[in-house]
């Protein structure tokens, strides 16, 4: 038995989550994380385009990306992996993603009560100062 305490490898864990289900289908990938935030990326994929004439990415993959990034930010903030459910996730689309660009989703958990986590975030395609979308919402911590 090792004398080293268990250390949660968030990058490895998040990378594993993006290899399954709808996150795999949209091509979500780990990008970066901190104590209360997570970034995921979706490389440009013509199969996710909503209009073949323009090459603009559909809104659904961006919503999925933001739901996953904000959800993971809660686990990072609490330091525990616990069941949770999206109560409300509002997304304001500011502009379409540029065709051919990777979309980065940044999610942050900024407050937690006994049973509710509050999140915010944004998606961009290379410049965080020119976001594609902003998100805000709440998650129910189902184990509470």
Q: Which residues does each PLM region occupy?
A:
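HotDog/MaoC-like acyl-thioester-processing domains
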Residues: 1-8, 97-104, 108-144
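Compact, glycine-rich, soluble single-domain proteins
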Residues: 53-71
